[in-house]
């Protein structure tokens, strides 16, 4: 099944009122963050994906409510999927997504490639087992 059948990149809810701007520098811990008066609101725990720039395809889990930086889209994943399974899948293809950007001046995530990636969809319990195994292996190589 193609990734497009279980997830999509959405803009987020337009809102007004002072909120923290969740840009890449803030999310990487390299800035204290700035506030802005309007933007595309996301909630703590949402996942957002970098769609513009050098690191297109990088996914972040939102640490607090705020406005997405302008280089992000919100990553919506179907409830039939175990979210960590999909996030690990996207992480597996991170280099492909970074190297297949579109645009000359400011490279953008190639959404055609993103949405056309083929993902196996095992039963939900198997998705959970796979993620647990990935986590076990990852903890041993850290």
Predicted regions and their residues:
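Generic recognition of stable, solvent-exposed alpha-helical segments in well-folded globular domains
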Residues: 1, 37, 43-44, 81-88, ...
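Non-catalytic DNA-recognition/assembly elements of restriction-modification systems
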Residues: 1-14, 21-28, 116, 120-142
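Short alpha-helix capping/helix-loop boundary micro-motifs
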Residues: 31-37
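A short beta-sheet element
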Residues: 38-91
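A short glycine-rich beta-alpha junction/loop motif
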Residues: 66-73, 103-124
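Conserved catalytic alpha/beta cores of large enzymes that bind or transform nucleotide phosphates
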Residues: 85-93, 103-105, 118
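Short amphipathic alpha-helical signal-transduction/dimerization elements
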Residues: 91-98, 138
